[in-house]
Amino acid sequence: NNYCKIKCRSGIHTLCKYGTSTKPNCGKNVVKASGLTKQENLEILKQHNEFRQKVARGLETRGNPGPQPPAKSMNTLVWNDELAQIAQVWANQCNYGHDNCRNSAKYSVGQNIAEGSTTADNFGSVSNMVKMWEDEVKDYQYGSPKNKLNKVGHYTQMVWAKTKEIGCGSIKYIENGWHRHYLVCNYGPAGNVGNEPIYERK
């Protein structure tokens, strides 16, 4: 498996560790659905690109303080099946958190994760989870060293100008009576890199 040759700062590549099969591996949890529909893929991509455009055009009024400045340029994201496969294999472990190594041969890969939990008999939509990432903008101050990644890191990855591709995976399962919906999105090239700005302001 070629993924075993991919180097990361720490850990073994997710597809080396768990293999390339996208079968759920959730222990005693009852899996209700694994994977995203074509429609959900399109929805996630559209939601990301619409939000990126909104921010790039200077139309995002929220922030700490807002509004967010317009961007000189921002790539339009395209879907990448390899990133989606790596995301899906990780989601299938039902282990909420970031995996250690998810890079592709092309570039280092960033990641956003979200989980919805409810005792009701439904799992919540992926678009609501993506919206939670967008909403972190309310705590973001452009260019400030005071931004905390644990508060705004999903937002900053979403609008990272140099990121070009996205691929996501998801799993819905029941754990101790809780309906859990876990979404993983991988981004390449990765955002949140060192002291680089999320985008250059116009």
From Swiss-Prot:
Q: Which GO terms describe its cellular component?
A: extracellular region
Supply the CDD domains for this chain.
Answer: CAP_euk (cd05380)
Which is a Pfam family this sequence falls into?
CAP
Name the tissues where it is expressed: Expressed by the venom gland.
Q: Which cysteines are joined by disulfide bonds?
A: C4-C16, C8-C101, C26-C94, C168-C185
Keywords carried by this UniProt record: Allergen, Disulfide bond, Secreted
Q: Which domain of life is it from?
A: Eukaryota
From the Swiss-Prot or TrEMBL record, state where the protein is found. Secreted
| Ranges where the SCP domain occurs | 46-187
Q: Which InterPro entries match?
A: Allrgn_V5/Tpx1_CS, CAP_dom, CAP_sf, CRISP-related, V5_allergen-like
Q: Which PANTHER family match?
A: CYSTEINE-RICH SECRETORY PROTEIN-RELATED (PTHR10334)
Question: Family assignment?
Answer: Belongs to the CRISP family. Venom allergen 5-like subfamily.
Instruction: Write the protein's name.
Output: Venom allergen 5.01
Q: Which organism is it from?
A: Vespa crabro (European hornet)
